[in-house]
């Protein structure tokens, strides 16, 4: 008779006060925030990746401190500034971007000021994780959460560790920071999820190309990136971060994201460093209908923090982590804090994205709009790219709405 070790027959149960699933920008930032601010309890972070932090599926673009100051509300800007100053050290900046080229249907429509940084996201995340560990957090990479359930006013998650196999972690507070859809949300049914038209399938790769080293490029062409846009972000050494964002409701109809990506690289003279193309699903429908329930919370992409008009994800994820951390440290309400600080911007950006959707999905409509008023089109795109909360931007979109419907 084969006698199995007790560890195999009886899953090991680890106990913690806070379990954070996902070690990306949101999860790592929250772990660091809690332990640095003397949270009363153990903080454990797990991530399915075996390497801290790879692979990177991201444009890796962050705003300079002053870029968004005129465009967003003061309280939100204060949180953004905190996330930048606490995480973005000089050694993580790969390249300084000065301008943005906006290409619409193969033509350069405008070149606008765009003080941003191309960063080494992997190095930035590794540093945040290391700081979290130094402050007292427990971190386990190579550990995948399989399912989580409520149990005796706490939560129990079955996880799989590449070295130890399956075991359970018991926790008082559980946080889903594992992108969309989160295993926490799937297990506990916290949100209603997002409709296909509110999701983007984004590709990511690095490529050689003959483009200015201080100019980011976004390409809005519904034949190339229906419902989204393509991007070329220079790293400063002749290599560029590139990708295509395609709306999920059309991504697999007749074509697929990889085909769109290949056409994009061919048309814009880009030669990839590797043949492989990474992909991920990104929510662009604004914040989820709920952010948590009964000490189970969602942050980052899991709660829908990606900016709907530009796909920015790193700092918005950290903003949600900061707000949850603040609520846990000070005993305030995470939902109320999110609704006050972050939701107004997200709701406004969803509105702008939906107003522009008919153009993003129809090349001929995009052409007609450019012929009618290229100046209004370009300024609206630029404002939306900067997440503008200015009244003038709202007026542009409200005035443009009936015109867009008419020409579409």
Protein language model features and the residues they cover:
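Predominantly flavin-linked oxidoreductase catalytic cores and closely associated redox partners
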Residues: 134-268, 288
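Beta1/beta-strand and adjacent pyrophosphate-binding region of the FAD-binding site
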Residues: 12-26
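FAD/FMN-dependent oxidoreductases across multiple families
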Residues: 147, 248-324, 333
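A short, basic/flexible loop-to-alpha-helix module at the beginning of a structural domain
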Residues: 2-15
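Short beta-strand to alpha-helix junction loop
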Residues: 111-130, 249-256
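N-terminal FAD cofactor-binding segment of flavoenzymes
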Residues: 49-99
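C-terminal helical "tail/cap" subdomain of flavin- and related membrane-associated enzymes
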Residues: 326-408
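Glycine-rich FAD pyrophosphate-binding loop
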Residues: 35-57
